[in-house]
Swiss-Prot record:
Pathway of action: Protein modification; protein ubiquitination
Quaternary context: Interacts with 26S proteasomes. Interacts (via the HECT domain) with UBE2D1 and, less efficiently, with UBE2L3.
Biological process per Gene Ontology, one example term: ubiquitin-dependent protein catabolic process
Species for this entry: Homo sapiens (Human)
Lineage: Eukaryota, Metazoa, Chordata, Craniata, Vertebrata
Its biological purpose: E3 ubiquitin-protein ligase that specifically catalyzes 'Lys-29'- and 'Lys-48'-linked polyubiquitin chains. Accepts ubiquitin from the E2 ubiquitin-conjugating enzyme UBE2D1 in the form of a thioester and then directly transfers the ubiquitin to targeted substrates. Associates with the proteasome and promotes elongation of ubiquitin chains on substrates bound to the 26S proteasome.
Keyword flag Transferase: yes
Expression across tissues: Highly expressed in skeletal muscle. Detected at much lower levels in kidney and pancreas.
Stated name of the protein: Ubiquitin-protein ligase E3C
Length: 1083
């Protein structure tokens, strides 16, 4: 309110209460919290002090009571020994002594007292056990259990020399025996219950751990099972090992049995084997007379494997035990028991570490070579324990025995075999091949399954029938999911990958031994008897199967290069957690392993597809365009953008031994941009499955890659560095071999200009603008590959292959000639020249393959007679030794017979029914590979010096022949007319030209080829039409002299045609000229 008393300023207020004591709110809260903290701290200190004081008082009182009871025990013991007022042969007195001892017992102080008590309990066991039948039965039972547990603890100190282990062992024997209880208690069921409780209490208190230590301490390391009767303690220890197993198996429910087997497994078997365990205990348990409960043990093992193998690394020891003991019990297993056995193999084989032996036998293309370097040495005992690597190798050997193989095969071949049997077997085989790198011919099981047509058919049926439920609720085959490249759940991939991998590996191996006649279902007659075929599929089935395999490969490529970065999906997290994987790093590792499985699957499927494609190439069984895929739309202009000039490397990536987003296959320079997903997929297809792309498109890709490389090396300008050589026409090969050698001209990609000298040593007219070089290269290749030159021979069909006797003709320099010829053929491909050189199919296959060797199926293209004889030998049913063969071959080179051994000491090794397959393959290998290995290697190196083999591997052997020599297709005159030039006054409308084309239209196809060869030196049209012919086909006015013949300059693809206006005359003159081959320098 306002004052209207006339005051114009505020008067100061005076407070008579002194200074203000108000606190800020924050300060007040802080002070309050601090006081509360101090009070809480004081209460905590007081409580702790009370606890400590209570503990100290309790400890002091207990120690005092221990001393009192210990003294009382000693007095009773003294009285009993002196025959005083405390007789020991009294049940209640024994109970009192036990109660006292259990109260104060300390092992370091009271061991002797315990031993004394054991001695009396054993002596008066019936009196003590009788307490189980009275009111103190629960107390007595508890005391027995505690005494047995003290036995176990005492025996764990068995290394103490002052300890007498005989009494504790006798105590275990007496109070775990039915014979101790039955005479006193009478009730058999109650006795069983008592012993069951005692044994389980012992088991939970380290019974088997005590036996493990006791065996290793008290038995000599040199002991073997045969020494059982000579070492009394060995027999007792073995009985103690078996007693809980036998008792629980015969008298206890499954839950109790499981506990005993768990302790036996974790404490006794999962630890590294000592010599005593390895040479005595395991052979003893494996003996059929021991009656080990093998089938219940297998059932229990499946439930406890995760604890006893993953965490402690006990898988090798357990697996060895299972295999060794199983040798005498497999025959007695029920069908359900065999299935459990198969599951055990599946479980422990996957946890078995990779042994150095299996790692070293794997080929160099393996993805995990580093594992073998870190593995242990085979067998070097450390502290008396066998090494893991030694046990691993022993496990793999035992798994490969005849008995094991027959057991597993019988399980699979039963009519009642379920899908689970096949899937579990596939998982076992998959682990053997992938993780342990075992090759099919080296493992009995794999080899036997590979040649069982019924198994392969059923395997493919299972693969085809596997399906998964989609989000929409519909069931979709897993093969279809793979073919689409759609992501698959962890569970589904775990189901199909082992089956698919096994099928592809086994079928691939069987195809190696199935010759073409058997593959195509031709009847085989040997000595009047028809042989059964090992082919599991008909040709019609193979067509569908090959299509599925092709699409699966393409789908896996899509999975390997996903459109988006893969994430850990929810079902993967659930699946990983079910097997104990929880951390993100563990999940990432599991994902990497999963993707590695897809990569490995891709390899084997691709190999099988290529083998089927190779069969179809040699002899068609698939319809036209069967191998082409509608999924892939790869165009030359897109792919060739990936060419990297600076690196001079084809695709910017190395050949796909591995694919996947985690293992990049790219080898891109720092300046190169990263490839898109589409580009990565295209490169993967062209590298691994090029035949799914049309041949014409691949030819375009090849030519555009050549053009890109040529632009870098040669350029468009005429003044860039090139190669200038002078060649004598009569010595074309000799001069070219000298002047175009690697030492003189290391880079044949450069433009070559040739100056020719005629037979008189005079210069031939003309400047080389490319035509003379092409003429020269054509003549050079004809000369070099002429069988008369000695470097190449011809098969019965007139096809070229390296002459094995070339070294005898030209000496040790023969490899240089093959290197030179390889470079020259590469130069022809590089310059897009067609040369009519018909090569043998096996030779082209050797050039294209990643390995220089080819298999027996190519022998038919080299020597059909030898191939036929080997097939006869393979199917021969009489005594093979009667044929008088040994492991040698005879060469008749240049009239000189030479005996060559196929293997060391081969002349002394007869060919028998057992080793004839090895003989057949060695003969084929010698003829196809060993004889000409150096020739082919040098030729391939020369070819790769000019044209990368990666480019050529886009084509099969037949396609490469077409690339070299052109296709056997009719000549299109319309195409030829469209790309023909005219000179010297001629034009398309000139009367002579019109007559010429009418005449040519009337030619047969053979006459048209002769005309083309007359003008261009090659009877086949260019692969992509006459627009690719360089220089272009040209008709030049040859003058008005009607007596002259048409002539040609093949170096310029030029036809010199006189002015023949009469159709009959032109026809006769032209036919005469092309038949007589009037050519170079005759115009």
């Amino acid at each position: 309110m306002f004052s209207f008393e006339g005051d114009f300023k505020t008067r100061p207020k005076v407070s008579l209460g002194g200074a203000s004591r108000k606190e800020e709110k924050a300060s007040l809260l802080h002070r309050t919290q601090e006081e509360r903290r101090k009070r809480e701290e004081e209460r905590r200190r007081l409580k702790n002090a009370i606890i400590i004081q209570s503990f100290i008082r309790g400890y002091r009182d207990r120690k005092q009571q221990y001393s009192i009871q210990r003294s009382a025990f000693d007095r009773c013991a003294t009285l009993s020994q002196s025959g005083g007022a405390f007789p020991i042969a009294n049940g209640p007195n024994l109970t009192l002594l036990v109660r006292q001892l259990l109260f104060f017992y300390k092992q370091n102080e009271d061991s002797k007292r315990l031993i004394w008590l054991y001695q009396n309990l054993i002596k008066h066991s019936s009196l003590f056990v009788k307490q189980l039948d009275g009111s103190e039965r629960l107390t007595c039972l508890f005391q027995i259990k505690r005494l047995m547990s003290l036995c176990c603890r005492l025996l764990q100190n068995c290394n103490d020399d002052s300890l007498n282990v005989a009494l504790p062992m006798r105590m275990l024997e007496v109070f775990s025996s039915e014979n101790t209880y039955l005479p006193v208690l009478q009730d058999a069921s109650y006795v069983v219950s008592v012993i069951e409780q005692i044994l389980h209490y012992m088991i939970h208190n380290g019974y088997y751990r005590s036996l493990y230590l006791l065996i290793n301490s008290k038995l000599p390391s040199s002991i073997e099972y045969s020494d059982l009767s000579r070492v009394p303690i060995a027999k007792i220890l073995l009985e103690n090992v078996l007693k809980p197993l036998h008792f629980t198996y015969n008298s206890c429910p499954e839950g109790a049995r499981q506990q005993v087997f768990t302790a036996f497994t974790e404490e006794f078997l999962a630890a590294p084997f000592t010599d005593q365990i390895f040479h005595f205990i395991i052979p003893a348990l494996a003996d059929a007379q021991t009656v080990f409960p093998y089938e219940p043990f297998l059932n229990a093992l499946l439930l406890i494997e995760s604890r006893c193998s993953r965490k402690s690394g006990g898988a090798p020891w357990l697996f060895y035990f299972v295999l060794t003991v199983g040798e005498n019990y497999l025959g007695a297993l029920s069908e359900e028991g065999l299935l459990v056995y198969l599951r055990v193999l599946q479980t422990f084989l996957s946890q078995l570490p990779v042994s150095p032996a299996s790692a070293s036998c794997h080929d160099s293309a393996s993805d995990s070579e580093e594992e073998s370097e870190e593995a242990d040495k085979p067998s070097s005992p450390e502290d008396g324990r066998l090494s893991v690597s030694y046990i691993t190798e022993e496990c793999l050997k035992k798994l490969d025995t005849k008995q094991q193989t027959n057991t597993l095969l019988n399980l699979v071949w039963r009519d009642s075999a379920s899908e689970e049997v096949f899937t579990t077997m596939a998982s076992v085989c998959h682990t053997l091949m992938v993780q342990h790198r075992m090759m099919v011919p080296k493992v009995r099981l794999l080899y036997s399954l590979a040649f069982n047509a019924r198994f392969l058919r059923h395997l493919w049926f299972l693969i085809s029938s596997m399906s998964t439920r989609m989000i929409t609720g519909s069931m979709v085959p897993l093969l279809q999911v793979i073919s689409r490249g759609s992501p698959m759940s962890f569970e589904d991939s775990s189901r199909i990958i082992p089956l698919f991998y096994l099928f592809s590996s086994l079928f691939s191996h069987s195809l190696i031994s199935i010759h073409d006649n058997e593959f195509f279902g031709d009847p085989i007659e040997v000595v009047g008897q028809r042989q059964s075929s090992m082919m599991p599929f008909t040709l019609e089935e193979l067509i569908m199967l090959s299509r599925c395999l092709r699409d699966a490969c393409l789908g896996i490529i899509k999975l390997a290069y996903p459109e988006t970065k893969p994430e850990v999906r929810e079902e993967y997290i659930t699946a990983f957690q079910s097997i104990g994987v929880t951390t993100s790093s563990e999940m990432q590792q599991c994902i990497q392993m999963e993707q590695k499985r897809w990569i490995q699957l891709f390899k084997v499927i691709t190999n099988l597809v290529k083998m089927l494609k190779s069969r179809d190439t040699r002899r068609n069984f698939c319809p036209p365009n069967h191998w082409l895929s509608e999924q892939e739309d790869i165009k030359a202009d897109k792919v060739t953008q990936l060419y990297v000039p600076a690196s001079r490397h084809v695709w910017r990536f190395r050949r796909m031994g591995r694919i996947g987003p985690l293992q990049s296959t790219l080898d891109v320079g720092l300046e190169s941009p990263p490839l898109s997903v589409s580009e990565e997929r295209q490169l993967a297809v062209l590298t691994e499955l090029p035949f799914v792309v049309p041949f014409e498109e691949r030819v375009k890709i090849f030519q555009r890659l050549i053009y890109a490389d040529k632009q870098e090396v040669q350029g468009d300008g005429p003044f860039l560095d090139g190669i200038n050589v002078t060649i004598r026409r009569n010595y074309i090969y000799e001069d070219a071999y000298d002047k175009l050698s690697p030492e003189n001209e290391p880079d044949l990609k450069k433009r070559i200009r040739v100056h020719l000298l005629n037979a008189h040593g005079l210069d031939e007219a003309g400047i080389d603008g490319g035509g003379i070089f092409r003429e020269f290269l054509n003549e050079l290749l004809k000369s070099g590959f002429n069988p008369n030159q000695g470097f190449f021979k011809t098969t019965n069909e007139g096809l070229l292959y390296p002459n094995p006797a070339a070294q005898m003709l030209v000496g040790d320099s023969f490899a240089r000639h093959y290197y030179f010829l390889g470079r020259m053929l590469g130069k022809a491909l590089y310059e897009n020249m067609l040369v009519e050189l018909p090569f043998a199919g096996f030779f082209l296959s050797k050039l294209l393959g990643t390995s220089a060797d080819v298999d027996i199926h190519h022998l038919a293209s080299l020597d059909p007679e030898v191939y036929k004889n080997l097939l006869f030998l393979k199917s021969y049913e009489d005594d093979v030794e009667e044929l008088g063969l040994n492991f040698t071959v005879v060469n008749n080179d240049l009239g000189e017979a030479q005996v060559v051994e196929l293997k060391f000491g081969g002349k002394d090794i007869p060919v028998t029914s057992a080793n004839r397959i090895a003989y057949i393959h060695l003969v084929a290998d010698y003829r196809l590979n060993r004889q000409i290995r150096q020739h082919c290697l040098a030729f391939r190196q020369g070819l790769a010096n000019v044209v990368s083999l990666e480019w050529l591997r886009m084509f099969d052997q037949q396609e490469i022949q077409v690339l070299i020599s052109g296709a056997q297709v009719p000549i299109s005159l319309e195409d030829l007319k469209s790309f023909t030039n005219y000179s010297g006054g001629y034009s398309a409308d000139h009367p002579v030209i019109k007559v010429f084309w009418r005449v040519v239209e009337g030619f047969t196809d053979e006459e048209k080829r002769k005309l083309l060869k007359f003008v261009t030196s090659c009877s086949r049209p260019p692969l992509l039409g006459f627009k690719e012919l360089y220089p272009a086909f040209c008709i030049h006015n040859g003058g008005s002299d009607l007596e002259r013949l048409p002539t040609a300059s093949t170096c310029m693809n030029l036809l010199k045609l006189p002015e023949f206006y009469d159709e009959t005359l032109l026809r006769s003159k032209l036919l005469y000229a092309i038949e007589c081959a009037a050519g170079f320098e005759l115009s």
